[in-house]
């Protein structure tokens, strides 16, 4: 397990609401909460940047964090991330913000403290480019979209 440094930017975290935590021993994501000043109605088609009240510092360049949607919000209510996935670099130290987009047909109320996204730590391998004239042959080659069949 990796120790993740965190700064609490909203005093309600740790008092009214717990620090992000894993829901079960097998959970991959830590739940992030909407640390809004008041409940907010997200209209259909609207995107809103929501503070989490928390900043983190990963510190290890071999790791990054992803902010991902919560499956229930997307499936049941059409609430997904406006940027689809948020990437948190290992040297970022600012507040974690969640871009929420209502792709549904009805307005959705985001309550103060509601779990709106999840944070997942992932390994990172940094690459450098090696410029070549040609690639070694592979079975796929340059086959792109639909190369393996229609269904």
Swiss-Prot record:
E.C. code: 3.6.1.23
Annotated InterPro entries: dUTPase, dUTPase-like, dUTPase-like_sf, dUTPase_trimeric
Coiled-coil region list: none
Protein family membership: Belongs to the dUTPase family.
Catalytic activity: dUTP + H2O = dUMP + diphosphate + H(+)
Any GO molecular function: magnesium ion binding
Source domain of life: Bacteria
Protein's pathway: Pyrimidine metabolism; dUMP biosynthesis; dUMP from dCTP (dUTP route): step 2/2
Single GO BP term: dUTP catabolic process
Entry keyword set: Hydrolase, Magnesium, Metal-binding, Nucleotide metabolism
Binding site for substrate: 70-72, 83, 87-89, 97
Ranges annotated as spanning the membrane: none
PANTHER family in UniProt: DEOXYURIDINE 5'-TRIPHOSPHATE NUCLEOTIDOHYDROLASE
Cofactor(s) needed: Mg(2+)
High-level lineage: Bacteria, Pseudomonadati, Pseudomonadota, Gammaproteobacteria, Pseudomonadales
Function: This enzyme is involved in nucleotide metabolism: it produces dUMP, the immediate precursor of thymidine nucleotides and it decreases the intracellular concentration of dUTP so that uracil cannot be incorporated into DNA.
Protein name (database record): Deoxyuridine 5'-triphosphate nucleotidohydrolase
Matching Pfam families: dUTPase
Keyword Repeat: no
């Amino acid at each position: 397990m990796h120790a993740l440094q965190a700064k609490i930017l909203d005093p309600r975290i740790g008092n009214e609401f717990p620090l992000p935590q894993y829901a079960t021993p097998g959970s991959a994501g830590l739940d992030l909460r909407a640390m809004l000043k008041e409940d907010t109605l997200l209209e259909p088609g609207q995107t809103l940047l929501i503070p989490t009240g928390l900043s983190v510092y990963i510190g290890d360049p071999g790791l990054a964090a992803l902010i991902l949607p919560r499956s229930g919000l997307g499936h049941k209510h059409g609430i997904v991330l406006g940027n689809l996935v948020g990437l948190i670099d290992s040297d970022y130290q600012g507040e974690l913000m969640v871009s929420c987009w209502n792709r549904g047909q009805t307005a959705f109320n985001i309550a103060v403290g509601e779990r709106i996204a999840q944070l997942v730590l992932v390994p990172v391998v940094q690459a450098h480019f090696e410029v070549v004239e040609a690639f070694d042959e592979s079975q796929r080659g340059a086959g792109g979209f639909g190369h393996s069949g229609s269904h």
